[in-house]
Amino acid sequence: MNPLISAASVIAAGLAVGLASIGPGIGQGTAAGQAVEGIARQPEAEGKIRGTLLLSLAFMEALTIYGLVVALALLFANPFV
């Protein structure tokens, strides 16, 4: 395997995981903060807010997992070789 392709694949895998984690991380922090604020304002709606929050956090986390899958594909099933 060409060392340049190997090095580029490792760098791309790191960037894939890093960049795929930034957006969902910011989004999850914002969503959790807003959920806590909403529960503080309306404690009777806690169950509905919590359920919606957990569902949205799962969708956001899926984006990070997709970045991990791309990184693993670049490392172990390199399409450029």
From Swiss-Prot:
Keywords: ATP synthesis, CF(0), Chloroplast, Hydrogen ion transport, Ion transport, Lipid-binding, Membrane, Plastid, Thylakoid, Transmembrane, Transmembrane helix, Transport
Miscellaneous information on this protein: In plastids the F-type ATPase is also known as CF(1)CF(0).
Similarity comment: family membership: Belongs to the ATPase C chain family.
Presence of keyword Ion transport: yes
NCBIfam families xref list: ATP_synt_c (TIGR01260), PRK07354.1 (NF005608)
Localization, UniProt: Plastid, Chloroplast thylakoid membrane
Pfam families: ATP-synt_C
Lineage: Eukaryota, Viridiplantae, Streptophyta, Embryophyta, Tracheophyta
Membrane-spanning intervals of the chain: 7-27, 57-77
Gene Ontology MF annotations: lipid binding; proton-transporting ATP synthase activity, rotational mechanism
GO cellular component: chloroplast thylakoid membrane; proton-transporting ATP synthase complex; proton-transporting two-sector ATPase complex, proton-transporting domain
Role: F(1)F(0) ATP synthase produces ATP from ADP in the presence of a proton or sodium gradient. F-type ATPases consist of two structural domains, F(1) containing the extramembraneous catalytic core and F(0) containing the membrane proton channel, linked together by a central stalk and a peripheral stalk. During catalysis, ATP synthesis in the catalytic domain of F(1) is coupled via a rotary mechanism of the central stalk subunits to proton translocation.
Signal peptide coordinates: none
Feature type site, description Reversibly protonated during proton transport: E61
Annotated membrane topology: Multi-pass membrane protein
Gene assigned in the entry: atpH
Protein's GO biological process: proton motive force-driven ATP synthesis
Protein name (Swiss-Prot/TrEMBL): ATP synthase subunit c, chloroplastic
Stored InterPro entries: ATP_synth_csu_bac/chlpt (IPR005953), ATP_synth_F0_csu (IPR000454), ATP_synth_F0_csu_DDCD_BS (IPR020537), ATP_synth_F0_csu_sf (IPR038662), ATPase_proteolipid_c-like_dom (IPR002379), F/V-ATP_Csub_sf (IPR035921)
Quaternary data: F-type ATPases have 2 components, F(1) - the catalytic core - and F(0) - the membrane proton channel. F(1) has five subunits: alpha(3), beta(3), gamma(1), delta(1), epsilon(1). F(0) has four main subunits: a(1), b(1), b'(1) and c(10-14). The alpha and beta chains form an alternating ring which encloses part of the gamma chain. F(1) is attached to F(0) by a central stalk formed by the gamma and epsilon chains, while a peripheral stalk is formed by the delta, b and b' chains.
UniProt organism field: Solanum tuberosum
